[in-house]
From Swiss-Prot:
Transmembrane segments: none annotated. This is Putative membrane protein insertion efficiency factor. Pfam families: YidD (PF01809). It is found in: Cell membrane. Keywords: Cell membrane, Membrane. Residues 62-80 have a biased composition (Basic and acidic residues).
Length: 80
């Protein structure tokens, strides 16, 4: 299951993302965050990645937001 989910994100990175200008506000891009979250947390990592995408908007804080070792839908405060 992890491999399929990661393959979908890689498809997005290779074929869809290049069509749009870079817009991620975090140092680890949202798609790379999703891949790392899936690798660490399995399907829960998808939820973490979606929460991260919702946090990535023009009015949010920028900077580092690494994938936490524990499941959480909040921003990782250790990355600041």
């Amino acid at each position: 299951m992890k491999r399929i989910l990661i393959a979908l994100v890689r498809f997005y990175q290779r074929f869809i993302s290049p069509v749009f200008p870079p817009s991620c506000r975090f140092e680890l891009t949202c798609s790379n965050y999703m891949i790392q979250a899936i690798e660490k947390h399995g399907f829960k990592g998808v939820l973490m990645g979606l929460a991260r995408i919702l946090r990535c908007h023009p009015w949010s804080k920028t900077g580092k937001d690494p994938v936490p070792d524990h499941f959480s839908l909040k921003r990782n405060q250790e990355g600041e």
